[in-house]
């Protein structure tokens, strides 16, 4: 690694990244630029400014990226109906490409030689940040302190802070959650602590965004979501921005006990990891989007989308958002969304999301006159089915005549 004069750090203002500021200054004798993104994590980001200033940081970036995050990352992902390993809605994965993008942009703006992040050497986030950075700025240098230093425990980090007068408040350390948590506008995740035993049931007081399904209201909540080109643009007739859509759906879902998930997933780095997630808004969005597609997409387009979805989800999970293959898949997916317009009505009740209606005034491919079980007035000639069946059975009949066994 060549001489580092200036580094842009993804800075949260918490213990780990506050230690990293001073560690970078001490280890590399360099100037540190901090970048703090508000992507809906639910915490005040302004205090990060005072902490950075107290450590001698001269260039401080604090940005509200909530709208960009939902519009340019969350919504495109949901157009793909992306789910990793059948369950995970990719809430952590989707936040990393935007942060990586801004890190390298700020590095270019400030003339920095490198970027840095607080992801550990065991997790997926180090891969996601760095693949994104190299895709966008191939010459950038990356410093990952967790892969270099020996501060491998919370106690060592706290001691480092006290030795160097790093401004971190330890007054509430006894109240600190036993879990490693990460949040953005799409979800909040919980890892570590007792969750490292996959048989251990998470305590009820761990969950922060939702009530338990048992404690949810006894009366169902009905909502109507409006779609334009595959994206939600309104809730119950009220036009909302992308970030406001997700914020409102999170509240509706959380109030009705929706969006909890407890899984063991396969990390890209090779190990299995248990994680608990709350994704109330996303858990509503996914079936709603599939419902409006069921009405407006033709069969083969829908099936093609379903066939590429697992690859899309895997690319995103593994950190390849900026790869040519993900970008190519996105163009394919977006092309299918031109006529995904209309409304979906949903019932939210004690942890469940049920589609109860869907309609599209101009783009519906559902023709009741053909699909009806009643008299269709000649709209569909049932005799045509005989030839269709015989043609499709031809290869099966030929194979059967050879005496091939079917099992």
UniProtKB/Swiss-Prot annotation:
It is found in: Cytoplasm. Disulfide bonds: none annotated. Pathway: Amino-acid biosynthesis; L-arginine biosynthesis; L-arginine from L-ornithine and carbamoyl phosphate: step 2/3. L-aspartate binds at residues 120, 124-125. Keywords: Amino-acid biosynthesis, Arginine biosynthesis, ATP-binding, Cytoplasm, Ligase, Nucleotide-binding. It catalyses: L-citrulline + L-aspartate + ATP = 2-(N(omega)-L-arginino)succinate + AMP + diphosphate + H(+). ATP binds at residues 10-18, 37, 118. Homotetramer. Belongs to the argininosuccinate synthase family. Type 1 subfamily. This is Argininosuccinate synthase. The lineage of its organism: Bacteria, Pseudomonadati, Pseudomonadota, Gammaproteobacteria, Oceanospirillales.
């Amino acid at each position: 690694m060549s001489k580092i004069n200036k580094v842009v750090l993804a800075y949260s203002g918490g213990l780990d990244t506050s230690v990293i500021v001073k560690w970078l200054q001490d280890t590399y004798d360099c100037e540190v630029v901090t970048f703090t993104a508000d992507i809906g994590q639910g915490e005040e980001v302004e205090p990060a400014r005072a902490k950075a200033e107290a450590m001698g940081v001269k260039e401080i970036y604090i940005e509200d990226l909530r709208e960009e995050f939902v519009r340019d990352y969350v919504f495109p992902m949901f157009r793909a109906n992306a789910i990793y390993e059948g369950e995970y809605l990719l809430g952590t994965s989707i936040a990393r490409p935007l942060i990586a993008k801004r890190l390298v942009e700020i590095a270019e703006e400030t003339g920095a030689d490198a970027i840095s992040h607080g992801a550990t050497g065991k997790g997926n986030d180090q891969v996601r940040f760095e693949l994104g950075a190299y895709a966008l700025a191939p010459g950038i240098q990356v410093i990952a302190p967790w892969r270099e230093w020996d501060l491998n425990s919370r106690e060592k980090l706290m001691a480092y802070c006290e030795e160097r007068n790093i401004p971190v408040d330890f007054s509430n350390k006894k109240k600190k959650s036993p879990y490693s948590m990460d949040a953005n506008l799409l979800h909040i995740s919980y890892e570590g602590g007792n969750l490292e035993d996959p048989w251990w049931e998470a305590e009820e007081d761990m969950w922060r965004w939702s009530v338990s399904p048992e404690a949810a209201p006894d009366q169902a909540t009905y909502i109507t979501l409006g779609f334009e080109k595959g994206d939600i643009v309104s809730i119950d007739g009220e036009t909302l921005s992308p970030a406001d859509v997700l914020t409102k759906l999170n509240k509706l879902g959380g109030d009705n006990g929706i969006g909890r998930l407890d899984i063991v997933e396969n990390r890209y780095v090779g190990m299995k990891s248990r994680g608990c997630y709350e994704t109330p808004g996303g858990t509503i969005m996914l079936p709603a989007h599939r419902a409006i597609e069921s009405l407006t997409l033709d069969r083969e387009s829908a099936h093609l989308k379903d066939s590429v979805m697992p690859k899309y989800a895997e690319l995103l999970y593994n950190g390849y958002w900026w790869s040519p293959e993900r970008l190519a898949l996105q163009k394919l997916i977006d092309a299918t969304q031109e006529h995904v317009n209309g409304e979906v009505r949903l019932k939210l009740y004690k942890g469940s999301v049920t589609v109860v209606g869907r309609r599209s005034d101009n783009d519906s491919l559902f023709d009741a006159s053909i699909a009806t079980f009643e008299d269709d007035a000649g709209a569909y000639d049932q005799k045509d089915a005989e030839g269709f069946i015989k043609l499709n059975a031809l290869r099966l009949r030929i194979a059967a005549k050879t005496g091939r066994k079917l099992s």
